[in-house]
Amino acid sequence: MKEKSLMQELIGEVFGTFILILLGDGVVANVGLAPRLAAGGYNWNTITIGWAFAVIIAVYVSGGVSGAHLNPAVTLTMALKRGFSWGKVVPFILAQVVGAFLGALAVYLCYRDGLVSAGNPNVWTTGPGSVF
């Protein structure tokens, strides 16, 4: 099997982390804003199942390319315990941060109107700001 280049691995991490945050935070936004909008009747089970599918899809997308670390803590642990190259740790973490930021930005843009109508989305972690 052909070895992947570092750039391919980093792109895999960006896409995987993007998908993880897009789908995971997306379900939190949907459930959190639903009572304030037209829908309703969702609970923590919906969030749990949504995050489970987010992880499954993100691992499926990036697993074959980068190993699907998708989290700086996983990357650091892999370097400490599993022989992952220390030279790749910082690039992987940067790729994960970029992917997470892009995923959160996409959720914000998709749910911007709902966040604004719910009121002051940047202040309370128990309110609309809890989406992020």
PLM ranges: what are they?
Residues 1-132:
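Membrane-interface helix-loop junctions and terminal tails of multi-pass membrane proteins
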